[in-house]
Structures are given as structure tokens and as C-alpha cells.
Amino acid sequence: MKRLLIGAALLLIYSCEDTASKSIAQYDIDLFFKNISIGGGYFSSDESKLAFTSNASGIYNVYEVDINSGETSQRTQSDTESFYALSYIPNSNALLYSADKGGNEISHIYLLKEDNSTVDLTPEETEKARFFGWSKVRTCFYYQSNKRDERFFDLYKMKVDEWDPILMYENQQNLSVESVSNNERYFLLSKYTTTSTNDFYLFDNQTRALTQVSDGAGSYSSAGFSDDNTTFFFITDVGKEFAYLKSYEIESGKQEVIYESDWDVMYSYLSEKETYRVIGINEDGRTNLVILDINNDTEVNFPEIQDGSINSISISKSEEKMRLSVGSSKNPSNIYLYDMKSNRTKKLTQSLNPELNADHLVAAEVVRFSSFDGLEIPAIYYKPLQASKRNKVPALVWVHGGPGGQTRVGYYSLIQYLVNQGYAILAVNNRGSSGYGKSFYKMDDRNHGDKDLKDCIWGKKWLQEQNYIDTDKIGIIGGSY
């Protein structure tokens, strides 16, 4: 009797496995590439709309969405060139957007007027222009341009309604501008010396004094100035494995660590009224956002969102609304509105192809395995839903570009297609990858194609240890390495 019960139980288990594998819908590859890609999300002055970039038309164009009604309208009508939203013009429905020609990567800044006519604000043929944000009073915007010398980017500003370029900083020494103070007196400048180190300077545009801020070999990047122009903030990894946030008092030169984590701080900025500090952390291949209420010294808590995690935010000028970018490995990024007064969120876009069921896609997980020398290697793993001991599946080792780089948790159409078709994917973040400390990052210096490649091979060995993998069918895929 006992044997009969055990046998019946095993049959039930196998039957459930077979049923589960049969109930998973498998999709053609074109369905995965019919997802809509969405980026940006910039508030209008009255905070009633958000401008964003979307390829819903088949190519990237500028769109806007009404926050109250949720109605979306297409502002540009390109069918040949990709147009990328940059910002609304203050107190206007006009917009700035960026575009190149024929994929030549020589991007210009365009004005999209309220009547939807356009003006190229940076018209020189070989001029590459990059939007750099607005002045504090929003009467002009800043941008970088190489029109003077195509080797270097100078900093310009352009006044609204005049649209004439005004040179602010001429880059003669290959010192790139990273930030400008509100009074336009101070500039933070950077010059890279290696792939992981740079020199960092404070330039006084009034006295013409150049002060070196970097006081040790490492990485430095700007996190902006205080409103009163007395302090700036920067991110560095000097003396530590992971990047952290510091402040620097301009008059005294006093520096202070104001935030650090067990992972890299990627970026940080203050909200318009300096009520909130936003900090983005690269935590084990995921973006962890920390928003600090500076007045109360507390962390802002967000409501849970089913579609995924919050990857980036933008706080409105009134500091009453937030634009959230929300996505996961099963859902491409969408734009949400978060009302800070009511504590409510509202989904404003839909990026996943409605012909795809997210329940039949796979959530990525972070795994680790030991390489040939015992070093622990992180990886992002996708296990097919139909995989089991009785239904063994093939596998692929996924290799990201390099040197540096990192495969992160997020939505990848090709990966989801392959996993849906029954391929396990192990995206190896081999030694030399970013995000795991500067020692790990430097481990394949002058050694490309040796130890980093062995990490990928040992990733294959890890796959072979999984009892649902067909060990005779393991391949490798990737590019740009």
C-alpha cells in the first residue's frame, strides 16, 4: 500500500511538472520587440503634463501625457530620425528636444514651438550639442558644444526667446564641465587620467583660480552645488572600495562624508527647494533609490508598485509631485506619477506589449558562483519556467561588453525571448565589471581575455551543476568585448 501511495505521489508531481510546462505560452520573437521603449519624463511649468520619449510610432518621438486625464499626445511626427525629449520651455508648452541625422551621433538641440514648428538652435553642421540643464531662475538653459574645436566641449548658455549662444567656459585643457553654481561663478571640472581615475577641479570664473579638489587617485564626479553657492557635493571612491558622497565648503575647503553605503553611490542631487536629497545606489545589479528629507533627517517611503521597482525619479519644482520610472526584468520601464501629499501613485504609460503575459516571463535573480581561483563571481540568472529535472533545458552564458560594464537586473527583450523558448540565461559579471568595488573592477587590467574569460567558463560549470540543465547544450552569447 505504501509503495502504491509513493508511486501515486510521484506520478502527481511529474504530472504537475508536465502540466506547468504545457501551460506556459511561448511567443514569437517579434512580439517581444513590439514593446514600447519609454524614457525621460519632464514636468511642465504648471506641473499638469510630462514630456517623454517613446518609440510607440515605430521610431523615437517626443510625447506628452496629461497628468490628470492620462491622455497621451505625440508632439513630433518623425518617421526617419529619432527625436528625444529634453525639457519644456518655462511657462510655455514649447519643448526642447535632441536629434542627430542618419545616426551620425552629431546631436543638435531643437526648439519645438507651441505650434509644433521647429528651429535648430545649434545649426552648425559638425556641431555636437548636449543639453546641460536650466539656470536657477530658468531664463536660460546651458549646453555643451564642440563647435569651436571638435575635440573639446565648451559650455554655453542660451536665453529663452533670444536663442543666441553665449560662451561661458572655453575648454582649452580638456577639462570637462560637470556642474555650474547658481550664480555662475563656480564650475566643477574633470579630466580623466585612466578608465578608473580622474582629476577634479573647482574653477572660480571671477578670480580665474583653479583649485584641485582631488587629493588621491580615484574617481570623482559632481553632485551639484548648494542653492547659496557656498558648498558643492561630489562622489568619490578615494580610500574606499565603493563610491560615497561628500560635501566641500568652498571658502574653507572643509570636506565631509554625508552618505555612504556598502555599494556604489551612482548619483545624487537636491530637489528644487533643497527639501530632499535623491541618492541612487548600484546595489548588487539593481538601482536602490534613497530619498532623504533633509529637514527631518528621515527617509521618504514609497508605496509598493506591482510592476517592479523604482529605477529613477524626478521631483517637480513645487516638490509636491514625483515622476517615477518603474520597471523590472518582466516589465519594461513605465512612467508613474507619485503625489506626495496624497501618497498615491498613478500609472501613465503602458510599455509591455499587451500580447505578452508578464506571468509567462521570468524574474531575474542574483546568483554567485566560485571561479577557477575561488573568487566569487556575481551573475544575473534567468531560469525558464518550464525547466525541471524531467524537462532539462539548454543554457547560455551571457557576456556583457567591456572593459568595465555590468549586466543589471532589468528588462531585455532578447533575454526574455530566449528564456521563454526554454533557454536558461546566466549573465556573468566577470572580474573587471563595474559595481562590485574598485578592486574587483581592476582585476582584469592588462589581463583581458584570460581570467575574465575563465570566469565565464566557470559560469558554464555552475550551470552544469543545476539538475534541470542539459549539460551537453550550453553555449555563450554576447558582444562588444
Q: What do the PLM-derived regions correspond to, one by one?
A:
Residues 2-7:
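Sec-dependent signal peptide recognition
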Residues 10-11, 69:
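Short, linear, compositionally biased motifs with a strong N-terminal bias
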Residues 14-15:
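C-terminal motif of bacterial Sec signal peptides marking the signal peptidase cleavage site
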Residues 21-26, 49, 53-74, 93-94, ...:
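Beta-propeller blade-edge and WD-like acidic-aromatic loop motif
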Residues 22-37:
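N-terminal pre-domain segments of enzymes
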Residues 35-53, 80-98, 109, 125-144, ...:
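Conserved beta-propeller blade repeats
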Residues 302, 306:
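Non-catalytic carbohydrate-binding regions of carbohydrate-active enzymes
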Residues 312-481:
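Serine-hydrolase catalytic core recognition
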